[in-house]
Amino acid sequence: MMWVIDTSALIRLFVPDGPLHPEIETAFNRAATGADLVLAPHLLLAEAASVLLRKRRRDELSTEELRELLQAVESLPIRLCEHGPLLFPACALAEAHGLSAYDALYLAVAEQHSARLITNDEGLAKVARAIGLA
């Protein structure tokens, strides 16, 4: 099975400020054995760094914790996808469903690979369900 993970779900693995997505552990456990594939646009790394930096600036993380979490994010079995070729499909999804281009890129990756989206963003999850990607 193929999965696409967004930043909202990924960050919860490391900073438990809410419930984990019910399928995230299964997806990563299966990806670690090669049974499943977890995908994301390259954008994921920048978004994850931005969220963690924001937490660092609010003193919710130390500088060392920030570094460790960034290394942990990079070490996960996630295949990063070029998102440049997906800009037009992502913009079409964003326009049709009232999403940001950022969120729509995750849907475009999921659509391209017939994958299921793992997100903790309720608005994005609702759209993913509506178009058969959740």
Model-derived segments and spans:
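Acidic catalytic patch
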Residues: H42-L45, E65-A96
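Short glycine/serine- and small hydrophobic-enriched flexible loop segments
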Residues: S50-R57, Q112
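Alpha-helix capping/helix-boundary segments
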Residues: A9-L10, L44, P85-L86, Y106, ...
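Short beta-strand scaffold positions
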Residues: I5, L39-A40, C81, A101, ...
